[in-house]
Amino acid sequence: MNKRFNSEDKIILAIDGLDLSQAKLLLEKCPHVKWVKVGLELFVREGPRVIEILKGLNKKIFLDLKFHDIPNTMSAACFQVSKLGVDIISIHASAGLKALKDSKKASLEGATSVSVKPPFVVGITVLTSFSLKDFQTDLDRNNSIEENVLRLAKLSFDAGLDGCVCSPWEVKMLRSNYKNNFELITPGIRLNIDSKDDQNRIMTPHEAIDNGASKLVIGRSISKAIDPNMALIEIFKSIDSD
């Protein structure tokens, strides 16, 4: 019983690419989903009401808008979204130490202003869509993805953020540097490792958790499954297996 509860707390269902009615139908099919990720597309389409509806369904919400701007703009945005009562928000760690510190402070102030629990703030490191070749070519970087992830995770930690978002490939490396109270949230999770879609640095659920991930963001492996609830149950089983 406790084991299953722990598994439910580790899975964040990404409902990106779905409209609100499709998302609600998916959640009806998957009653054990505890966490939901709302991305940029859905939030822009539906606005803050999507948060109200999901909270009405007793879901915990990762609002993954990946803010990246000057410190004043980022912190102002974090102040506003924190008033919505979401549980986790994401910001780009590459915005710099001041932007991260100011955003964390603003998220606390925003939540406090309406008497809701402050959200965790996590720093985005290197997007899982990047391969090493694309990362070095597109961004004109000479160092490795791992080196950049380490640097951005440290920046997030030093700024007082609650964790970071990284690919499962970097989880083991980061977990050796940071204790379990520093959240490591990992997209790029696939049940079938051959199904990459637009992700490159991917891993199975069991491998990612075994390497030290706190939470897994999983979308298409569940939402595109013939039986989404069965796919979710299989993920729980894989996490629980030794």
From Swiss-Prot:
The active site is at K66 (proton donor). NCBIfam families: PRK00230.1, pyrF. Catalyzes the decarboxylation of orotidine 5'-monophosphate (OMP) to uridine 5'-monophosphate (UMP). Homodimer. Keywords: Decarboxylase, Lyase, Pyrimidine biosynthesis. Pathway: Pyrimidine metabolism; UMP biosynthesis via de novo pathway; UMP from orotate: step 2/2. Its EC number is 4.1.1.23. The lineage of its organism: Bacteria, Bacillati, Cyanobacteriota, Cyanophyceae, Synechococcales. This is Orotidine 5'-phosphate decarboxylase. GO terms for cellular component: cytosol. Belongs to the OMP decarboxylase family. Type 1 subfamily. It catalyses: orotidine 5'-phosphate + H(+) = UMP + CO2. The gene is pyrF. It comes from Prochlorococcus marinus (strain AS9601). PROSITE patterns: OMPDECASE. It holds the Pfam family OMPdecase. Substrate binds at residues 16, 37, 64-73, 128, 190, 199, 219-220. GO terms for biological process: 'de novo' pyrimidine nucleobase biosynthetic process; 'de novo' UMP biosynthetic process. One of its GO terms (molecular function) is orotidine-5'-phosphate decarboxylase activity.
